[in-house]
Curated annotation (Swiss-Prot):
Its main location: membrane. It is a peripheral membrane protein. SMART domains: AAA. This is Zinc import ATP-binding protein ZnuC. The lineage of its organism: Bacteria, Pseudomonadati, Pseudomonadota, Alphaproteobacteria, Rickettsiales.
Length: 246
């Protein structure tokens, strides 16, 4: 998709009511399972059109945090405050389709929504082109690669015309080239469409170029800041040395 066509196609730019800067604020969030604290003292603010990445080790609470924001986990303390009239799309870390459901990419993309959601055909066409899945629309979902599946799920998120997209380890199944393509796409939709993105990762080197803000957690926040600043943080080096080395 050319730069010129990207500039012209802005069908799913959204405007939120009563938003100055933040589309999401998390204040003093804590979460426990079976009396074991998973998250504690989490404070996060996400501005319109920003990409905020949660960096941390496996088992450090990243997925639990995403589930709280997505409304899946309810048993937390603290506050999760959204802008008025916000629309949210969620892309989980693990997604699978039963082998008993042989459906095409196109069918999945167009039919796996609530009947209440009005789908805009111009938005659908634009999303398919932007994400680059036009060539696999007639393929069976079970036959596409893991990387293509992630692009399909991203397209599915975008068709809902969200203001905030939650991505849990979205590139874990991709090779380096597919990762670069995915990050280019989310950078495009964040800046040109003013869609905010909250995503998780355990790979610091690949998320630095596309992130506006990085928050390092291991059950609680150890350090946070803009990419250039976070790389200089001594705490990051001490706590997350294995991730810096990647």
């Amino acid at each position: 998709m050319s730069h010129e066509s990207i500039e012209k196609n802005l069908n799913f730019v959204k405007k939120l009511n009563n938003v100055n800067d933040s589309v999401l604020k998390i204040e003093n969030l804590a979460l426990a399972y079976d009396n074991k604290k998973v998250l504690d003292g989490i404070n996060i603010s996400i501005e319109k059109g920003d990409i905020v990445t949660i960096l941390g080790p496996n088992g450090g609470g990243k997925t639990s945090l995403m589930k709280v924001v997505a409304g899946i986990s309810k048993n937390y303390t603290g506050s999760v405050i959204f802008a008025d009239n916000i629309k949210i799309s969620y892309m989980p870390q693990n997604f699978s389709i039963s082998k008993l459901m042989p459906i095409t990419v196109e069918y999945f993309l167009l039919n796996s929504f609530s009947k209440k959601l009005k789908k805009n055909q111009s938005v659908i066409t634009e999303v398919i082109e932007l994400v680059g899945i036009g060539s696999i629309l007639k393929n069976q979902v079970l036959e596409i690669s893991a990387g293509q599946m992630q692009l399909l799920l991203l397209a599915h998120c975008l068709i809902a015309e969200p203001d905030l997209i939650i991505l849990d380890e979205p590139v874990s199944a991709m090779d380096i080239n597919a990762r670069a393509k995915f990050y280019d796409i989310i950078g495009e939709i964040a800046k040109k469409r003013l869609i905010s993105i909250l995503m998780t990762s355990h790979d610091l080197s690949s998320i630095v170029p596309c992130s506006d803000y990085i928050i390092c957690i291991n059950h609680t926040i150890y350090c946070q800041g803009k990419p250039g600043k976070i790389m200089e943080d001594r705490t990051l080096g001490e706590i997350f040395s294995s991730y810096i080395a990647k």
